[in-house]
Amino acid sequence: EIPELTRYDYDVLNIPASTLNEEGLHTWQYKVEDINKLRDTKYKALFIVNPSNPPSYQLNKECVDALKDVVTRWNPNLMIITDDVYGTFVPGFRSLMADLPQNTICVYSFSKYFGATGWRLAVIALHEKNVFDRMIANLPRKRKSELAKRYGSLSMQVENIKFIDRMVADSRQVALNH
């Protein structure tokens, strides 16, 4: 669930995990036709909790294959942010990061695993070669100049600052990053 913040004027496409099995029981999976909406390059990011919260169902092969097709054939710059916090509760869990590593940021919180509800301690993982760095490198000159001002206190070669390092700097309000 993504909060709707008026500060950010995003168009949000909600894709419900609404499939049912033959007995009419909820499977917590997405319809392939809904995943296929992400083929449209107007969609820039996919935020997903996998396994789902609260039932801890991981994406099935059909959903993963549909996402792989979307990224491979239609929307190669789709940014995927996956919250894998419930992965330890699913035997044989496989993250989207394993299937779409260059497009995926994996978020993992320690609070669920250690039963420390309320803690705000987490890690992120990002492939060394990723769409985020590639998209920054391909920004127009004007936007790169804006970013150079923002991150200029970090490096003489601002253009070489990786996305993950920018995230760390932003989490510390850039100037306090040390």
Mark where each language-model region is:
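Conserved core segment of the aminotransferase class I/II
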Residues: 103-178
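Substrate-binding/gating loop at the entrance of the active-site cleft, primarily
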Residues: 1-12, 19
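Alpha-helix C-terminal capping segments
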Residues: 5-8, 35-39, 78, 96-100
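Catalytic micro-motifs at enzyme active sites that drive phosphoryl/nucleotidyl and oxygen chemistry
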Residues: 1, 35, 108-111
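Conserved, well-structured beta-alpha core segment at the onset of a catalytic domain
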Residues: 65-132
